[in-house]
Amino acid sequence: MAKLSKRQKLINEKVDSTKAYSIEEAVALLQELSKVKFSETVDAAINLGIDPRKSDQAVRGATSLPHGTGKDVRVAVFTQGANAEAAKEAGAEFVGMEDLAEQIKGGMMDFDVVIADPAAMRVVGMLGQVLGPRGLMPNPKTGTVTPDVVGAVKNAKAGQVRYRADKGGIIHGGIGKISFDANAIKENLEALISDLKKAKPASAKGIYVKRVSLSTTMGPGLTIDQSSLTA
């Protein structure tokens, strides 16, 4: 039998897998169990009452978290002319058209978000096989295909989270760092759930937000008592 690490022993001692924790309890416990030397990301997993096989029950979008993600987001923008200069001034690391596309085809992937103005999609469309599998393809539903590229850059830099239900109907997203206080994580989670409720498909039946859990990069998953949230 494999020997358990000190951290795993602590997790086994402290975590009750049958319990639904208040958001405050969950954050305190995750912080107690975080023994690594970096500030772990706090990840939310939200099980939705949808059938993702049905096209009219696809759930995707973007949420601006009130306290950001704690992550330094690097942005690539496809645009030209005055928009290009404005995007650079707003903080975009990479701005261009065909030249930027060639860099990406050559393997340059040093960015977290890709934004495009509508006219640039003729160029971005050729990168579908590169950007698509990584979840980086711009999309109007997530606000990353827009004539307002400056606003999109600012949103991305401020900690906007893009979400999309997976094949199991689960939304995954980083909502902050373990170094955040409990209230900041709570308000970020509530903002995400609030936007998910607004995006509820009309054809979805029964309980919509079925389960909410939080985990850290290296830690356990804790079920959240939804009555401790105001979303």
From Swiss-Prot:
InterPro entries in the record: Ribosom_uL1_bac-type (IPR005878), Ribosomal_uL1 (IPR002143), Ribosomal_uL1-like (IPR023674), Ribosomal_uL1/biogenesis (IPR028364), Ribosomal_uL1_3-a/b-sand (IPR016095), Ribosomal_uL1_CS (IPR023673)
Q: Name one GO cellular component term.
A: cytosolic large ribosomal subunit
Query: Keywords in UniProt for this one?
Result: Repressor, Ribonucleoprotein, Ribosomal protein, RNA-binding, rRNA-binding, Translation regulation, tRNA-binding
Q: Name one Pfam family in it.
A: Ribosomal_L1
Write down the superkingdom of origin.
Bacteria
Mind telling me which CDD domains this protein's record contains? Ribosomal_L1
Any one GO BP annotation for this protein: translation
Q: Which GO MF terms does the UniProt record name? A: rRNA binding; structural constituent of ribosome; tRNA binding
**Per the similarity annotation, which family is this?**
Belongs to the universal ribosomal protein uL1 family.
Share what the entry says about its subunit structure, partners included.
Part of the 50S ribosomal subunit.
Database matches in HAMAP family: Ribosomal_uL1_B
Q: In UniProt terms, what function does this protein have?
A: Binds directly to 23S rRNA. The L1 stalk is quite mobile in the ribosome, and is involved in E site tRNA release.
Give the protein's recorded name: Large ribosomal subunit protein uL1
* Organism from which the protein derives: Saccharophagus degradans (strain 2-40 / ATCC 43961 / DSM 17024)
Q: Which gene encodes it?
A: rplA
